[in-house]
């Protein structure tokens, strides 16, 4: 049981709750490719079994979200779960919002929410917040590839954003409000895409089974053909060079740097790095 599982996380559960549920269900190791806050819903990409070794490669991908923010209210957590700190009745025209969103495309610098797991001086930011300790809030650079308004009915505005990994949508909503000279908080958040994976292919927790898992051999389509003399290199996890390779079959552009090698009932995954191919993992008895 080695592959990827796409889960539609419901509101209220932590990402850890979902990982633990799946781990107990399948009795194997489970990892993830990016968490969601408890109040958020949507796509969680889970790595099952040996696929957990690919976590770092799938985490650094673009994310797409559908978010709803409420103007005229500010909370300490920057979302609807927090304590209200400020209210106003400033009305924002739709064209003002549209112009603001256009200006946000590209690289932006966003403050990290004080109620987040981001570590500063060895401690999570939310620990400082809960203890009332003042700390300098770090900023992170994010890339907004696209952002568009889906619906606006004051005080609520729903938008769709495609952004780089690690982008805090709560902070993005705060930045939108600042540029419009008002305040706002996030009231709804749903992840629609994580890299090439789409929420449309995800399963709710009630309908997960072994058949829901996308096997690694079905996910990675590019293939390397080698002679049996190279088998020892594969078993030992050694890198491969072009002279070790008999044939390269390019069947996929989504995971263009990843290749599979099938030999003696074992399945190996390699990643192309320049002129060499780096060993990533092995799955035995996969057929």
UniProtKB/Swiss-Prot annotation:
In Pfam terms, one family for this protein is: TruB_N
Keyword Cell cycle assigned to the entry: answer is no
Q: Does the keyword Isomerase apply?
A: yes
Q: What class of enzyme is it?
A: isomerase
- InterPro entries hit by this protein: PsdUridine_synth_cat_dom_sf, PsdUridine_synth_N, tRNA_psdUridine_synth_TruB
- The UniProt entry annotates the active site at 37
Any one Gene Ontology molecular-function term assigned to this protein's record: RNA binding
Q: Which UniProt keywords apply?
A: Isomerase, tRNA processing
Per the UniProt entry, the disulfide pairs are none
Q: Which reaction does it catalyse?
A: uridine(55) in tRNA = pseudouridine(55) in tRNA
> Per the UniProt record, which EC number(s) apply here?
5.4.99.25
Biological processes per GO annotation: mRNA pseudouridine synthesis; tRNA pseudouridine synthesis
Query: CDD domains recorded for this chain?
Result: PseudoU_synth_EcTruB
Concerning its family, UniProt says: Belongs to the pseudouridine synthase TruB family. Type 1 subfamily.
Q: What does this protein do?
A: Responsible for synthesis of pseudouridine from uracil-55 in the psi GC loop of transfer RNAs.
Q: What is this protein called?
A: tRNA pseudouridine synthase B
Recorded source organism is Caldicellulosiruptor saccharolyticus (strain ATCC 43494 / DSM 8903 / Tp8T 6331)
